[in-house]
Amino acid sequence: TTINIMCGQLTKDSGRVFIDKYDLEEDMDYIKRELGVVFQSSVLDSALSVYDNLESRAALYGITGMAFKNRLEELAKKLDFKDLLKRTVGKLSGGQRRRIDIARALFHKPKILILDEPTTGLDPQTRQLIWTVISGFRKSEDMTVFLTTHYMEEAAEADYVVIIDDGKISAEGTPLELKNIYTGDYITIYGVEEKDIKALNIEYERIRNGYRLSVPNTKAATELIIRNPQLFDDYEITKGKMDDVFLAVTGKTLVGGAEK
């Protein structure tokens, strides 16, 4: 819903929407020129070739001739679809089609790239390629990425995260801020006996070759180690994950990118 409102496909019930300081109602034409959008469902024309889809899209922004060829070559190389240019979109796999969707959205060098669950259902290799390319363009073209996702490892890479549950904002902040508020730290310790771990009187779980201890924060972890130096010859401290944040905020878990 949020993305459809931002793109002008749905009318908001109330309030005002500003994108890059521009009012959505007053400056829609400008905003549309500055946005690149990858919807959850592909908007490519299945009857046309990859080349024709991208050529027609580029023409809407006045990108023709050598400018079109140069941008096409750049995107085809980075997103690895040069061999697909003559293929009909309807014959592409899901991962191939998603790469073309992203190329379509990036063609006019948008200031803001909107991604609506762009990697759902994709294999790990394609997901990694897509994020490598997007991260590269974000830096080289000074582009903002607005992402909706159920994959918390993707949210962990964001500069700012908003968790929405049942249509309302439940929590927001940087990944580090959210982890500090909603999760603790973990100490993974190796080469010790369970009786020594029990003597610490803190929550723990047995893992392969060691134990994982739960502590409120990094300060508590440091104090525990200082008090018991004889136990901590081989250990590591890690923060909770964004999955832990999501569970703490919403009471729900995410399995395979979907709520459960």
Please give the residue ranges for each predicted region.
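Conserved ABC transporter NBD signature motif
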Residues: 15-23, 31
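Conserved ABC ATPase "signature" region
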Residues: 55, 59, 66-84
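Conserved ABC ATPase signature
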Residues: 88-92
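Conserved catalytic motifs of ABC-family nucleotide-binding domains
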Residues: 109
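Catalytic Walker B motif of ABC-type/P-loop ATPase nucleotide-binding domains
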Residues: 113-116
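Short, charged/small-residue-rich alpha-helical element at the C-terminal edge
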Residues: 183-253
